[in-house]
């Protein structure tokens, strides 16, 4: 793990015997301690094989839910047809669905303690539908071929903290448009941007938030997908291509990450299982009244794992 905190030598001993019989115990244990720095590798939707069948395993944290099912086009969005089970007799739910594949759309149908059904996007999804739809999409991050080894090696020999920097901050959706007013996708944007950045002498480009968000008119500061680049400009691998091209051109990439608050959109983190999970349950601390947004419960271990994992995810997966 890039944070250096999740090392086996630090955290294996308390659950050593349990993890021999059930390997999933360790990521759940670390998650609940606030020390799972790569929670996205366990939670969310992951393509894998079980008993010779390829499918997708779904895992989600919902401590107050009485039932959860995975719904999507594959089951006509019918609640209860694919029920999840608890993996820890407490708050983490799991289901493997054979036959599901990349780009399949899904949500979690959560039954609250009040008996209501709420349909939620996956907090750990890597990809999402483009507005106005807001479902999550199964996505495989593997397979992108990076070409930025020279950049990575140069960074190891450079004083990146004290060295000179000249940063160009920009909004990906409005910096420059195609004919007809359509935005460039991530990869195309790099091709347009590199000559300008080079000519103007900038060392880095800083993107206003590109994590998934609901409102086109915003700059992206109310995030609904902390592990998903917004699909307005393409797929996760398109964003990888953007970073790769920038690095090949000798340009660093800085991403604007927003843990300060999150919106109240019903498909998002807000009251995820009918009650406060990600937000502070104290109304005096849990809401930005002036923004109409929620504040994370920074003292909750599971939220700490979520946010630390998000920050490190972008560094690890997008270089």
Name every feature range the model reports, one short phrase each.
Residues 54-58:
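Structural beta-strand segments of beta-rich domains
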Residues 68-70, 106:
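Short beta-strand elements bearing conserved aromatic residues within extracellular beta-rich modules
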């Amino acid at each position: 793990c890039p944070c250096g905190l999740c090392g086996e030598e630090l955290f294996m001993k308390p659950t050593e015997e349990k993890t021999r019989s059930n390997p999933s115990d360790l990521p759940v244990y670390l998650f609940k301690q606030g020390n799972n720095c790569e929670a996205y590798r366990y939670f969310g939707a992951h393509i894998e094989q079980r008993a010779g069948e390829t499918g997708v395993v779904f895992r989600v944290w919902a401590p107050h839910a009485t039932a959860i099912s995975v719904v999507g086009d594959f089951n006509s969005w019918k609640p209860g047809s694919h029920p999840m089970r608890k993996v820890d007799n407490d708050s983490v739910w799991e289901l493997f669905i054979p036959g599901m594949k990349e780009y399949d759309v899904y949500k979690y149908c959560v039954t609250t303690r009040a008996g209501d059904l709420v349909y939620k996007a996956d907090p750990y999804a890597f990809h999402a539908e483009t507005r106005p739809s807001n479902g999550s999409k199964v996505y495989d991050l593997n397979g992108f071929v990076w070409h930025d080894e020279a950049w990575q090696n140069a960074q190891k020999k450079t004083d990146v903290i004290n060295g000179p920097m000249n940063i160009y901050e920009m909004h990906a959706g409005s910096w420059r448009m195609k004919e007809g007013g359509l935005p460039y996708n991530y990869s195309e944007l790099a091709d347009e941007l590199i000559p300008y950045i080079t000519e103007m002498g900038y060392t880095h480009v800083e993107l206003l938030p590109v994590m998934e968000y609901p409102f086109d008119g915003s700059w992206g500061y109310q995030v609904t997908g902390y592990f998903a680049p917004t699909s307005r400009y393409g797929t996760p691998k398109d964003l990888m291509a953007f970073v790769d091209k920038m690095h090949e051109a000798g340009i660093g990439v800085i991403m604007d990450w927003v843990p300060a608050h999150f919106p109240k959109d019903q498909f998002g983190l807000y009251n995820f299982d009918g009650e406060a999970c990600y937000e502070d349950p104290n109304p005096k601390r849990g809401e930005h009244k002036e923004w109409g947004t929620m504040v994370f419960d920074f003292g909750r271990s599971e939220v700490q794992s979520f946010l630390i994992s998000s920050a490190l995810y972008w560094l690890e997966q997008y270089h």
